[in-house]
Regions:
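Structural microenvironment flanking redox-active thiols in thiol-disulfide oxidoreductases
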Residues: 1-63
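Loop/turn elements at helix/coil->beta-strand transitions in domains of secreted/extracellular proteins
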Residues: 15-19, 64-68, 86-87, 94
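Short loop/edge segments at beta-strand edges and connector loops
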Residues: 71-73
Length: 129
């Protein structure tokens, strides 16, 4: 959530050349789970895909991501394949090959956002050749 403005800036800068997509996998701090003080999202962990979709929509309404948001299956297919927990950027090249898996740690999305321009510049230069 704290990295939203950084990510939105990347979408503004690279969005004409790069497809950005956020995948809502699961609530990081549900009520009765790994709660954090002053969490602006006081929600229960979803038990159905419809509930997860509603949480993703609420998240987007509050956070205003400037990219499409899709939702993982309730059995966590994307989470199991890409291991993006808690937050992680995964970069695919134009052929769908994973070229970078961001940092999976507190603050990892912010740090990945700082590193992403260099990576995207290199990838876009390669694809132009």
């Amino acid at each position: 959530v704290r990295s939203t403005s950084m990510i939105n800036s990347l979408v503004d800068e690279y969005g004409k050349d790069v497809n950005f997509l956020m995948i809502y996998i699961r609530e990081a701090h549900p009520i009765g789970g790994r709660e954090v003080p002053n969490n602006q999202f006081q929600v229960n962990a979803p038990t159905t895909l419809i509930q997860r979709c509603e949480l993703a929509e609420d998240f987007d309404d509050r956070i205003q991501m400037q990219m499409p948001i899709v939702v993982d299956t309730i059995d966590d297919t994307v989470a199991d394949v890409y291991a993006p927990w808690p937050n992680r950027m995964v970069v695919l090249d134009g052929n769908g090959k994973i070229v970078d898996v961001g940092i999976a740690a507190a603050g990892g999305t912010r740090e990945s956002s700082r590193q992403l321009p260099g990576l995207l510049d290199r990838l876009l230069k390669k694809e132009d050749n």
